[in-house]
């Protein structure tokens, strides 16, 4: 009996040592809902996480260095759920970090099967789930600024927003505040809201852009991933304007793109990864960052912006941006 107890004690001690070793070693996965090379947003996501992990690993012993895995899921949204499920099923990632407004609704059902999995989701909003922390960029500001310059530049006073799909941030913030900004610039402005149905179909994006152009729309905001390239092609062919979201897009079509509102995705992905590795992630919370915090900006110094947009309109944009940054104007 004593031998059995001794063996059991040794076995438990051995197992606990193994578990302690596993507990001391963290593993991070980055889920890219798209293609890294095709998306500055996802490239910044990956670079920020990498930087935080590499920085932390410099202070860790080899056996405790953090493992980093990057899954490039592609643009077919129907495959995102199964691929996230596969990551969760491996049960080895302490956190899965990603970025897309549609992801909270996608991961919540998956968490019913994998209740211990943690997610940090950027460019998204979700409160109240202990397994999820989200950070969104102030898209009230982004959308309003984009709509404001669109309203100033439009000669027909007809604008369009072409989205990949409908989701809460799109329906409740981006679309209404894009319209609000356009009407603030010119009360006669109208916004035609169209849906592609996915994040990759450039042909359909072009078809929708052609259709709204025929109705007199002369400024389009595309938020549809890879389908945005089709919208740009159509805009160039129809000699109308594009307002751009999330990164500096002026080089994509000089003379056609009139604005770029940018978000500091690399800096934010670095911050949330570092926060997680330090055990400081505020789970179940949703954070918003904007112009005052230095995570949202409106590009004013690009040569193509200066060349394409008249000086009087650039001055109006500069004044509005300065007022927001100083707290004189709050967009909400």
Residue ranges and their predicted role:
Residues 1-27:
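Short, low-complexity disordered leader/linker segments with a strong preference
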Residues 21-332:
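A residue-level marker of the well-folded mature domains of exported/periplasmic proteins
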């Amino acid at each position: 009996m004593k031998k059995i107890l001794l063996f059991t004690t040794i076995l438990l001690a051995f197992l606990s040592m193994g578990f302690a070793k596993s507990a001391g070693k963290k593993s991070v996965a980055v889920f890219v809902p798209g293609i890294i090379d095709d998306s500055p947003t996802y490239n910044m996501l990956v670079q920020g996480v990498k930087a935080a992990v590499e920085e932390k690993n410099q202070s860790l012993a080899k056996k405790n260095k953090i493992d980093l895995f990057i899954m490039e899921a592609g643009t077919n949204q129907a495959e995102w759920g199964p691929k996230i499920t596969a990551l969760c099923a491996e049960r080895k990632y302490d956190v899965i970090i990603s970025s897309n407004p549609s992801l909270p609704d996608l991961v919540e059902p998956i968490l019913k099967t994998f209740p211990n999995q943690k997610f940090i989701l950027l460019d998204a909003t979700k409160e109240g789930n202990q397994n999820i922390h989200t950070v969104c960029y102030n898209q009230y500001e982004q959308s309003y600024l984009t709509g404001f310059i669109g309203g100033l530049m439009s000669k027909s006073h007809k604008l369009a927003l072409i989205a990949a799909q409908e989701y809460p941030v799109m329906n409740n913030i981006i679309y209404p505040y894009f319209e609000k900004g356009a009407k603030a610039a010119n009360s006669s402005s109208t916004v035609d809201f169209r849906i592609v149905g996915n994040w990759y179909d450039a042909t359909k994006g072009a078809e929708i852009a052609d259709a709204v152009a025929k109705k007199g729309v002369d400024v389009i905001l595309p938020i549809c991933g890879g389908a945005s390239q089709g919208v740009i092609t159509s805009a160039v062919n129809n000699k109308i304007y594009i307002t751009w979201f999330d990164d500096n897009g002026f080089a994509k079509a000089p003379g056609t793109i009139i604005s770029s509102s940018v978000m500091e995705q690399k800096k934010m992905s670095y911050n949330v990864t570092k926060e997680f590795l330090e055990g400081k992630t505020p789970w179940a919370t949703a954070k918003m960052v904007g112009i005052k915090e230095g995570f949202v900006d409106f590009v004013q110094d690009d040569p193509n912006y200066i060349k394409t947009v008249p000086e009087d309109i650039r001055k109006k944009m500069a004044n509005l941006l300065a007022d927001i940054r100083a707290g004189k104007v709050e967009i909400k």
